[in-house]
Amino acid sequence: MPQLNGGGGDDLGANDELISFKDEGEQEEKNSENSSAERDLADVKSSLVNESETNQDSSSDSEAERRPPPRSESFRDKSRESLEEAAKRQDGGLFKGPPYPGYPFIMIPDLTSPYLPNGSLSPTARTYLQMKWPLLDVQAGSLQSRQTLKDARSPSPAHIVSNKVPVVQHPHHVHPLTPLITYSNEHFTPGNPPPHLPADVDPKTGIPRPPHPPDISPYYPLSPGTVGQIPHPLGWLVPQQGQPVYPITTGGFRHPYPTALTVNASMSRFPPHMVPPHHTLHTTGIPHPAIVTPTVKQESSQSDVGSLHSSKHQDSKKEEEKKKPHIKKPLNAFMLYMKEMRAKVVAECTLKESAAINQILGRRWHALSREEQAKYYELARKERQLHMQLYPGWSARDNYGKKKKRKRDKQPGETNEHSECFLNPCLSLPPITDLSAPKKCRARFGLDQQNNWCGPCSL
């Protein structure tokens, strides 16, 4: 290898020095032109989006569409090369067609119009829905072009890289639920639009043009292995296996298709598992009366019916008892004597109180001899026989039972003004049960023992 002499070193310079050629300067000029063209394109596209959002006049829209974006030949060449590389990766890479027909596709059409008036593909085709699964970047351009597109839009989160596939957040002017996510068994041809949609017509030439280039499919099929592994951010929208999913479109969302094709906003067509859960509690935590389960309602209704039935039964018993006449027990010998001699005692004495009259009759009864009392005992025996013939099934316990029931029916809060008679410790006689007549202490103790009277009787 020939060696250079020391004299020529000053002319050539150091060995590690970089020598610039004319081609490198031309490349820098091309890069500057490309960056300026991309900035102009982003400005034009943002103005188009703003005009479409504010629904301005058709004249302003047509002027914005007729405005030609400055583009260079080198940028078009780069976009074509990137499209060819993406098509090759899609044919031989991860996202191949399904191995068997009928496997559901996930189809994500463009959020806005992906084509400019001159028929070229706009950078919005590279934006994706805000989801957490990896999608194939169709236009895998250089890192510089993606960075300029990101800077032209509103600030968005950093790229989420999963298996070296970038996922970019969509711009702020598009609603996250705008794209149409459907599962279908039909295959869509890459170059032909759906039959129910009108063809896109060029405003300048009037010739219909296809919405997508023929070499790129507008829908991205997912392989069977990746569908089950992708976590869906909208959990209640993910269908279960074997169940169809309906389009998610409402009138309030932006959609690139005519409004006549939008689906009604009501969720009546959704399966039950897709409807989001609703809160059934008030702010206080008490369930709404219309949301009470049928079992609770049945139990409450059964308890109400049982209580009504028991109350009706008790009312019927009370009515029957009222209808039955009160049967008095047969008079004994002393009662027969009192019945006969009461008028004579009242005529002889000036006392008008029954208690004093009863005391006088009692003294006279005990003063009678056995033979005189035997007459009244015989009358009492005949009275009992007659009573047994008239009321064969009668017993004195029937009347006592009624009195007990009356005591039970009384409420514990009820009080009587003669209650002090029961609490008087000086009383040696049994308590008085009949409280309807006043002045019981006077009849019991008499006027001589007023110190034993209760409070109400002493008044």
From Swiss-Prot:
Portion annotated as DNA-binding: 327-395
Region annotation (Disordered) ranges: 1-96, 295-327, 397-418
Tissue expression as described in the entry: Detected in adult brain and liver, and at lower levels in intestine, with a clear increase from the distal colon to the duodenum. Detected at low levels in heart, lung, kidney, pituitary and testis.
TM ranges: none
Record GO cellular component, one term: PML body
Top-level lineage group: Eukaryota
Record keywords, A-Z: Activator, DNA-binding, Isopeptide bond, Nucleus, Phosphoprotein, Repressor, Transcription, Transcription regulation, Ubl conjugation, Wnt signaling pathway
Regions of compositional bias (Polar residues) in chain numbering: 47-56, 295-305
Predominant location category: nucleus
Protein modification: Phosphorylated at Thr-178 and/or Thr-189 by NLK. Phosphorylation by NLK at these sites inhibits DNA-binding by TCF7L2/TCF4, thereby preventing transcriptional activation of target genes of the canonical Wnt/beta-catenin signaling pathway. Polysumoylated. Sumoylation is enhanced by PIAS family members and desumoylation is enhanced by SENP2. Sumoylation/desumoylation regulates TCF7L2/TCF4 transcription activity in the Wnt/beta-catenin signaling pathway without altering interaction with CTNNB1 nor binding to DNA.
Cross-link Glycyl lysine isopeptide (Lys-Gly) (interchain with G-Cter in SUMO): where in chain: 297
Subcellular location: Nucleus, PML body; Nucleus
Annotated segments matching region CTNNB1-binding: 1-53
UniProt GO molecular function: beta-catenin binding; chromatin binding; RNA polymerase II cis-regulatory region sequence-specific DNA binding; sequence-specific DNA binding; transcription cis-regulatory region binding
Residue positions where Phosphothreonine is found in the record: 178, 189
Cross-link (Glycyl lysine isopeptide (Lys-Gly) (interchain with G-Cter in SUMO2)): 22
UniProt biased composition (Gly residues): 1-11
Record GO biological process: BMP signaling pathway; bone mineralization; canonical Wnt signaling pathway; cellular response to starvation; embryonic digestive tract morphogenesis; embryonic genitalia morphogenesis; embryonic hindgut morphogenesis; epithelial cell proliferation
SUPFAM superfamilies: HMG-box
Assembly, per entry: Interacts with TGFB1I1. Interacts with SPIN1. Interacts with CTNNB1 (via the armadillo repeat); forms stable transcription complex. Interacts with EP300. Interacts with NLK. Interacts with CCDC85B (probably through the HMG box); prevents interaction with CTNNB1. Interacts with TNIK. Interacts with MAD2L2; prevents TCF7L2/TCF4 binding to promZIPK/DAPK3oters, negatively modulating its transcriptional activity. Interacts with ZIPK/DAPK3. Interacts with XIAP/BIRC4 and TLE3. Interacts with DDIT3/CHOP. The CTNNB1 and TCF7L2/TCF4 complex interacts with PML (isoform PML-4).
Similarity-based family: Belongs to the TCF/LEF family.
PANTHER family for this protein: TRANSCRIPTION FACTOR 7 FAMILY MEMBER, TRANSCRIPTION FACTOR 7-LIKE 2
Protein name in UniProt: Transcription factor 7-like 2
